[in-house]
Amino acid sequence: MQGLSTDGGLFVPEEIPKMTLQEIEKLIDMDYPNRTAKTLQKFLTDYTEMELGESAELAYNWFDSPSKVPLSILVKNPKNSKSPICIMELWHGPTSAFKDMALQILPRLMSLALKKVGETKEILILVATSGDSA
């Protein structure tokens, strides 16, 4: 495993997986961990559905809201729209920062990746704030 690509940049998918309208509509009724697992399945094809589901469930168990990512309605009936305008509350994780959304599942996925390639060493993930979350 390596953190940066050989050219010094970040790893990005060669192509972005497509989702049908039906697949997207199915996500609506799912809780956040299941929605996360279903979405990640499109990108992380070397993980099983069970691995992604368990990783997401464990990652987001620590959030202090039952819905994990509540929506707050800002405008109930905006002009020219059938849907309210909402904002996602991304501060319900263990550190109260939006970074919890990604950084709670990342170590679980990295540990699984190491096991899949037969690596027995432990990993350490060091995370620092960029200063945008006072």
Give short role names for the model-derived ranges.
Residues 1-134:
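PLP-dependent amino-acid enzyme catalytic core
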